[in-house]
A protein has these predicted regions:
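Anion-recognition interface
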Residues: 33
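Glycine/charged-rich beta-loop-alpha catalytic/anionic-binding loops adjacent to active sites
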Residues: 39-42, 72-73, 163, 203-208
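Short catalytic/ligand-gating loop segments at beta-alpha or beta-beta junctions
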Residues: 194-206
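A short acidic, glycine/proline-enriched capping/turn motif at secondary-structure boundaries
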Residues: 8-9, 36-37
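Residue-level detector of flexible, active-site-proximal loop/helix-junction positions
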Residues: 36, 111-112, 201-203
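Short beta-strand elements at the ligand-binding edges of bilobed clamshell
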Residues: 40-53, 209-212
């Protein structure tokens, strides 16, 4: 049994292995690493990340160009859960480095403070007349609570109550986080043009941004899993 994916896939493969043993089935389970989050232990990088990072970099490069003509504040929500690797890849889209977006980047490795966020957005907008922002879906407060959940409690919304089959809070399955941040900005800077997008599944499946190295490593990982399975070592 081969299961390709990240942490949840590894957990699922383990559950299947335990259940097979419990029922007396002869089954060997292999987890083949692949995750755009780039957060698996004992890895330098994960298959899937390179291609997704290219998509994010190109998306921000194009969005920054658009923002130069339709000036305002643009918030883009990027996947990654509790790892900021994919959001950090947004800066690879900067062309010259001078006033290129994203101008602000928010990762889950640091506590998200709404007050600081608004102050930084305002300062950037006043300096450049525009602002492009990269935000990880996993931003959270000092207690580790996802910001979307905090915002929902503050606003009386039910937007952050869903969890997946592994018990993980749904972070960017909808545009709720982007809308929440856009609303905060609109309240702090009334009259300002503010837009938000959630990249969603496109960033992990776009064929136009496949990394050659990523493609080769993914194939090698799958091949290694098959060799391990038929070798009888496991």
């Amino acid at each position: 049994f081969f299961y390709i994916g990240g942490n949840d896939a590894a957990e699922t493969a383990h559950i299947v292995s335990l259940e097979a043993a419990k029922q007396g089935w002869e089954m060997r389970c292999f987890h083949i690493p692949k995750t755009i989050d780039n957060d698996l232990k004992v890895t330098d990088h994960c298959p899937g990340y390179g291609s997704a990072a290219r998509f994010v970099a190109h998306a921000f490069q194009g969005d920054d160009r658009d923002n130069r003509s339709l000036r305002g504040i643009k918030v883009n929500i990027v996947m990654g859960r509790h790892a900021g690797w994919l959001t950090a890849a947004s800066v690879l889209g900067r062309r010259t480095g001078k006033d290129d977006g994203p101008h602000l980047v928010y990762l889950p490795e640091r506590v998200f403070e709404p007050t600081d966020f608004l102050a930084e957005v305002k300062a950037t907008y006043e300096r450049l007349g525009r602002c492009v922002i990269a935000v990880s879906e996993g931003i959270h407060d000092a207690d580790g609570k996802p910001f979307l959940q905090t915002y929902a409690e503050m606003s009386g919304s039910a937007m952050a109550g869903e969890v997946d089959s592994h018990g993980n809070v749904q972070l960017s399955g909808t545009g709720a986080l982007g809308d929440a941040l856009a609303n905060l900005i609109k309240e702090a800077l009334p009259g300002t043009r503010v837009r938000a997008d959630t990249f969603g599944y496109l960033q992990r499946s776009h064929p136009g941004d496949v990394s050659t190295v990523d493609q080769e490593e993914a194939r090698a990982a799958g091949r290694a899993a098959v060799v391990a399975a038929v070798s009888g070592q496991y």
